[in-house]
Amino acid sequence: MKVNEEGFAIDDKEYAMKTELKFASKHSSRLKIERNVMESYSKCDAQCKEHFSELIDFGQSPVWKWIVMTIVGPSLEELKMKYKPSDIPPSTILQCGLQTMKAIHDFHQIGFLHRDIKPANYCIGYGSKSETIYVLDFGLARKYRLPNGQVRPPRPKTKMIGTPRYCSRASHRCEELGRRDDYESWFFMFIDLVDTTLIDWKGLTRPDAYAKKQELFTKLKTYEKHPMFKVISIYLDNLVYDSEVKFGVLREAITDYARGCKLTLKEPLVWFNQSTCPSPSTAPGTGASRMATNIDLKSIASDRNEENSLDRSKTGTLSFNNSKNKKPSRY
């Protein structure tokens, strides 16, 4: 599908487009859920949507439904695969933990649970936004409040939701997920960024992975190597389905740890040490895409997994302020 087949003009900017076949059933349509989430946070003030990509427009053609949004850089999963943990400064990892956690806090503020927190669903910003980490992929999101503002009563039984490596223990038990579960998934993800040896259930069956997660929470309650893990594990383990998670408690655990390690959390995000930094001559595009870290965002992002149906315009993007453009149909 050409990006301008609906009659849009092409300009010199780039956006991202997510598509879905129009005949997808209402129950299987994740794009509509994503659109609802994006419309919800678009109404928030700037501070509360710092970690969300901007919704540019949405519509449908005879075959496709589509959403156009601001473009982002590589995902944390891609960066984890590309660089060794020793290449990433501790300050960057801790700031990554804080930003990804703040994104969850803001997501809950608009009334939704994400339910699929993992490194692949976080991306660093593109170009001038590369100091910001964005949360993406809201296809499994669910409202957790009723119209009167009360937390929805839990359903007696649900199915396992999320990615087995990072999903919460409640998801393994097929229980209704609450705000605590997004944070528990975030915790597994954060641990995996700090100390990859602790997440040792890759490739195991679901029951065995659940048992390993239970063991990890028990272990971390007396874990002295990274004291912040001890604080966070104890706090999260005491929450129940409808608990309101105190973001400040988790943030303070990380900032206290940084202070004890004499780390500043105001340095630029750097995804590898300068000794391994590619020179401009061997990293085309870095000057235009990422000044501080010299990451070639375009080359990494072009390898992104196709399962997310994320398409980039090679020549530009849609322009919505051309009076000659015909208005797309909505969905």
UniProtKB/Swiss-Prot annotation:
Region span, Disordered: 302-331
UniProt-annotated catalytic positions: 116
Domain named Protein kinase: residues: 1-270
InterPro entries: CK1_Ser-Thr_kinase (IPR050235), Kinase-like_dom_sf (IPR011009), Prot_kinase_dom (IPR000719), Ser/Thr_kinase_AS (IPR008271)
GO cellular component: cytoplasm; nucleus
Pfam families the record matches: Pkinase
Catalytic activity: L-seryl-[protein] + ATP = O-phospho-L-seryl-[protein] + ADP + H(+); L-threonyl-[protein] + ATP = O-phospho-L-threonyl-[protein] + ADP + H(+)
UniProt EC number: 2.7.11.1
Biased composition (Basic and acidic residues): 302-314
GO MF annotation terms: ATP binding; protein serine kinase activity; protein serine/threonine kinase activity
Alphabetized SUPFAM superfamilies for the sequence: Protein kinase-like (PK-like) (SSF56112)
Family per record: Belongs to the protein kinase superfamily. Ser/Thr protein kinase family.
Name this polypeptide is given: Putative serine/threonine-protein kinase ZK507.1
Organism: Caenorhabditis elegans
